[in-house]
Amino acid sequence: MSLAPSSYPSLYSSPSLPRTQQTKQNPSLITQSSFISAKSLFLSSNSASLCNTHVAKRRNLALKASETESSAKAEAGGDGEEEEKYETYEIEVEQPYGLKFRKGRDGGTYIDAILPGGSADKTGKFTVGDRVIATSAVFGTEIWPAAEYGRTMYTIRQRIGPLLMQMEKRNGKAEDTGELTEKEIIRAERNAGYISSRLREIQMQNYLKKKEQKAQREKDLREGLQFSKNGKYEEALERFESVLGSKPTPEEASVASYNVACCYSKLNQVQAGLSALEEALKSGYEDFKRIRSDPDLETLRKSKDFDPLLKQFDESFINESAINAIKSLFGFNKK
């Protein structure tokens, strides 16, 4: 409750009535004065009752308006517009998890794809669109609530041992993507009353959203590179992972994944680094000379799995191997 300002003294106290000296008066005048006072009281009483009547009317109107709003809300709720409650489940997966994730409009982490034959696929529990609500910590048995996308992906990639995941089952509904869903479009059209202009508005919203996401990806990439340059690899990973979760172009995905691999290499996280490097190669990264000479990847190059990984994608190496095989077949390599 707020206090009334001091400029309104009537809200604080009533002014005292003026004092008059008692004088001898004509009885008739006294009676008349008394009559006027009684009349004034009568009028005050009537006006009070009138005020109460108006207040009662206003209350009735307010109640009717409230009932109308309630009925309107009930009708609106009949279309299934109420916030939906989702089932949760908990499951443990082994590496390779066989899951791809994306960043939702709310900054959360959602399943974007389930790779056939992976640990997640074998459980039969996951569906595309399910939301991550908690995961195992990097070490031990502690459970960490899912933070924003970059931090959650950092935890998942760094996890040593089986990964326990607490999920929110969305039943295949991917409603938190960057664009308006079909359900949202239909709802918007119904509320707008005229479809054509609303559709144009939705298309414009989607265009602006894509433009905004692209600008954000570029910003995250620049900040990630700066963090990496300053040796702040964990902060850099959050930015690069955010790029990867925001529907990047193949070129953006390849560059971001390559930098993720470099960061994990500097943090001596070999398996996570090799996984990110594989994603970079699958996204079209082809600077194999740089991969074999970049000092940031030195730790990964020491791994026995490094060369076999590159040989899967390096066509120049494949062609060289094919030529050597042919030479051996026809005896050209014999001295």
Swiss-Prot record:
TPR-type repeats, residues: 217-250, 254-287, 289-323
Full protein name: Protein MET1, chloroplastic
Tissue specificity of this protein: Expressed in leaves (at protein level). Mostly expressed in leaves, stems and siliques, and, to a lower extent, in flowers and senescent leaves, but not present in roots (at protein level).
Signal peptide span: none
CDD domains named in the record: PDZ_canonical (cd00136)
Organism (species): Arabidopsis thaliana (Mouse-ear cress)
Main location: plastid
Task of the protein: Involved in photosystem II supercomplex formation and repair, probably acting as a psbB/psbC chaperone on the stromal side of the membrane.
Keywords carried by this UniProt record: Chaperone, Chloroplast, Membrane, Photosynthesis, Photosystem II, Plastid, Repeat, Thylakoid, TPR repeat, Transit peptide
Bias kind Low complexity: ranges: 1-18
Composition-biased stretches (Acidic residues): 78-88
UniProt GO cellular component terms: chloroplast; chloroplast envelope; chloroplast membrane; chloroplast stroma; chloroplast thylakoid; chloroplast thylakoid membrane; chromoplast stroma; nucleus
Chain segments carrying region Disordered: 1-29, 66-88
PROSITE patterns reported in the protein's UniProt record: PDZ, TPR, TPR_REGION
Domain (PDZ) ranges: 97-136
Disruption phenotype: Conditional reduced growth in fluctuating white light intensities conditions, with near complete blockage in photosystem II (PSII) supercomplex formation, and concomitant increase of unassembled psbC (CP43), thus leading to reduced PSII efficiency and biomass accumulation. Increased sensitivity to high light conditions, associated with the loss of PSII supercomplexes and accelerated D1 degradation.
Domain of life: Eukaryota
Transit peptide, from-to: 1-73
GO BP: any one term: response to light stimulus
Induction context: Repressed by wounding at the transcript level, but not at the protein level. Strong level decrease during senescence. Low levels observed in etiolated leaves and accumulates rapidly during light-induced greening.
Taxonomic placement: Eukaryota, Viridiplantae, Streptophyta, Embryophyta, Tracheophyta
Compartments (UniProt record): Plastid, Chloroplast membrane; Plastid, Chloroplast thylakoid membrane
Database matches in SUPFAM superfamilies: PDZ domain-like, TPR-like
Membrane topology according to the record: Peripheral membrane protein
Assembly notes: Interacts directly with stromal loops of photosystem II (PSII) core components psbB (CP47) and psbC (CP43). Associates with PSII subcomplexes formed during the PSII repair cycle (e.g. PSII dimers, PSII monomers, CP43-less PSII monomerand PSII reaction centers).
PTM section of the record: Phosphorylated rapidly (e.g. within 5 minutes) but transiently at threonine and serine residues after wounding.
